[in-house]
Amino acid sequence: MESTPFSGVANQIHTLCERPTYGEVKDGALDVKRQHKCPGPTSGPSPGTNLSGCIRMNDDPSMEENGVERVCPESLLQSREYSSLPLPRHTSSTDGTITSSDPGLEILNMASCDLDRNSLCKKEEDTRSASPTIEAQGTSPAHDNIAFQDSTSKDKTILNLEAKEEPETIEEHKKEHASGDSVVSPLPVTTVKSVNLRQSENTSANEKEVEAEFLRLSLGFKCDWFTLEKRVKLEERSRDLAEENLKKEITNCLKLLESLTPLCEDDNQAQEIIKKLEKSIKFLSQCAARVASRAEMLGAINQESRVSKAVEVMIQHVENLKRMYAKEHAELEELKQVLLQNERSFNPLEDDDDCQIKKRSASLNSKPSSLRRVTIASLPRNIGNAGMVAGMENNDRFSRRSSSWRILGSKQSEHRPSLPRFISTYSWADAEEEKCELKTKDDSEPSGEETVERTRKPSLSEKKNNPSKWDVSSVYDTIASWATNLKSSIRKANKALWLSIAFIVLFAALMSFLTGQLFQKSVDAAPTQQEDSWTSLEHILWPFTRLRHNGPPPV
C-alpha cells in the first residue's frame, strides 16, 4: 500500500473529532466527567507526552460552566502541539512521502481545530437548553455568555499565534532531522557488514549445513531443468504479445490524431497540439522498448544475484571436499610408508632363512664321523623345512599384516579371523640352532652333536604331541626326493656293473635255498606223508612266517 500525503492528516482529523462524553448532573451543580482519548499518530506514542493530561475528571460540585468551556481549548492546544511536533520526525523516518511543510497540511490542521471548537460549543449549548434545572451558583445566563465569548476570542488569538510559530518549528525540525540523518546514515552499512560476516562464519563453520544446502540447491536446479524450456517459451510469448498490443495502441492513437487534423484546420493552436501529441506518441513507443529492455536486464541481474548465492554455497562445498580429499590422501601415503617399512624389515629374515638352509646342508656334508647321528636328527628338520617352504610366503604375509596393525596402534577387529600359525616350535628351534652355529664356528664337533641331540628330542616330542597336516605331504616329498636321487645315481653309474651285481645277488639267494633243501637231514620217528608242493613250501618257510618269542615264557 502506497502512503498518500494526506493519509496521516486524515487519521489525525478522525482522532481529533472524537467528542467527549459528559456525565450526570447532581445537586444543581454541573458535575462533568470528561474522558478524552489522547490523539496521536498510528505508529505509537512519542516520548515527552503526558498521559495524565489526556484524562481529566472534575469532581468539584461548585465548578463553573466556564470550566467546561476551558477544557476544550486546553485539550485542543495539547492535541495541536502533539500533532504538530512529532509529525515531522515520524514522516522523516519513513520514505519522506509525508512532509509537514505543505501548506495544505497547515490548513487542514487549523480547520480541524475550528471544527472541534465549534462542535464542543454546540454540544454545550444543547446541554444547557435541554436541562433547565441546571443553574450555576452565583452566576447568570448573561454572565455565562460573556464568559463563553471571552474564551472563544482567547482561543482564536492562541490559534493565530500557533499558526505563525508553526513554520519556524517545522524548519527547526527539518534541520534537526537533516543533521540526525547525516549522523545515523553510516550505521546501516556497518550492520549489513556484520550480518554478512556472521553468515559467512556460520556457513564456513558447519560443513554439514553447507552440504545440506548444496543438496537442496542441486535438487532445486534439477527440478527446474524439466520445465525450463516451457517457461522460457511462455515468457517470450507473453512479452511479444505485450509489445504487439502496445504497438497497436500507438498506431490507433496516431490514426485518431490524423483523423482529428482536418477538423482543426482553422485553429492553429489545435494543429500545434496535434503535432506535439504525435511526437510524444512516437517518443512513447521508443520509451516502451527501452523500458522492456531495462526490465529484462533487471530480471537477469536479480537472477544472477540469486544464482551467485547458490554458486557460493556450491564452491564452499567443493572446497570442503578438496580439504577432505587432501587429508585422506595424506593418511593413505602415511599408511603406504608404514607398510613399506614393514616389508623391508621382514625381507632380511627371509634371506637369513635361506642362508641357514644352505649352511645346514654344507655342515652335514662336512661331518662324516657323525653322519649317522646328524642324519637321524636332521630327518624331521629336513621334512619340516621342505614343508615350510611352500607355506612361508603366506605366513610372512599374515605376520606382516599383524605387525602393521600393531605398529599403527589400532586393535584388530573382533570380526577379523585369527591368523593361523603353520610354523611349529621346532622350526624356531632350528633357527636358533643356526644362529648359535654362526656364532660358534670354532667350537669342537662333540659340542655341535650335543646341541643337535638337544634340539632333536623336543622337536620329536612336539611332533608326536602336535601332529600337523603338512607332515604327510613333507614325508611324501622326501620319499620322492630320495627316489629321484636314486634314479639319478643309477643313471650316472655304469649299467653293466649294476646288472652284474643284481644277477649275482639273485643267484646266491637261489643257491642257498636249494642247498638247504638238498642237505637237510631226516629225523627219527618223524611222520612221513606225501604232501603237495604248497604244503611242503609252507613247511619249509614256517620259521620265517611263524611268530617266535625269544624271551622266557610268562609265569
UniProtKB/Swiss-Prot annotation:
One of its GO terms (molecular function) is microtubule binding. The removal of the C-terminal lumenal domain occurs by proteolytic processing. Residues 1-495 are cytoplasmic. The modification Phosphothreonine is found at T91. It comes from the Eukaryota. The chain crosses the membrane at residues 496-516. This is Inositol 1,4,5-triphosphate receptor associated 2. It holds the Pfam family MRVI1. The gene is IRAG2. It is a single-pass type IV membrane protein. Expressed at high levels in pre B-cells, mature B-cells and pre T-cells. Expressed at low levels in mature T-cells and plasma B-cells. Expressed in germinal center B-cells, splenic marginal zone cells and B-cell lymphomas. Expressed in neuronal cells in the cerebral cortex, epithelial cells in tonsil, adrenal glands, zymogen-producing cells in the stomach and epithelial cells in seminal vesicles. One of its GO terms (biological process) is single fertilization. Residues 517-555 are lumenal.
